[in-house]
Amino acid sequence: MLTLRKASDRGLANHGWLKSFHTFSFASYRNPREQGFSDLLVINDDRVAAGKGFGQHPHRDMEIFSYVLEGALEHKDTLGTGSVIRPGDVQLMSAGSGVAHSEFNHSATKPVHFLQIWIVPEVAGAKPRYQQEHFTAQKKRGRLQLIISPDGHDGSLKVRQDARVFAGLFDGKESATLELPANRYAYVHVARGSVELNGQPLREGDGVRVREEQLLTLSNGVDAEVLVFDLRPQELPEMP
């Protein structure tokens, strides 16, 4: 069963320097029907103006990853990490027992467009850690590349939860099929462009809850970039 969450139905926070679309309830946006899905708690589609960003702020007991679509995002944290995240890079910060970080647009002239995604961890109070990896467009072209997993399989980043995240690029006749293990949920998010999921047309910003499906086929893309989350079969996130 596929349940569509239209891009136009998302929450919107427009602060001038920041324009953020919220797939699920976040900050001042509250929707009782959209409180997350399985262990997936947040998908924020953020556009940050040149030279602007989020000052240092704390997190704990959350798996937070950033996926840059355009521009460059500068990250600093209390673990001593300093990095710049660009398209193709995936950054995963496991907040664990507590960490503070800042994120700013690295450019003084161009905006940055990125997704920030939160996954609830399976254990509380773990040691904080930071990971970053680059996945080339070639690895994602016409296929679903594993970018996050519990065990770091195929060069993916390790997440502290029974969740897997795939990224793919699709255009024209390119297609890929993901076989889900039995009794799993999934969530599909179209980061940009348009694509079909099992024949259902999707546009940029659309999301789909997936239940009781074994095969997910992405096809007929137009400059599409897609994230697919393989998740535990539960409706709402539960903090550890």
Where are these predicted regions, by residue range?
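Jelly-roll (double-stranded beta-helix
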Residues: M1-P240
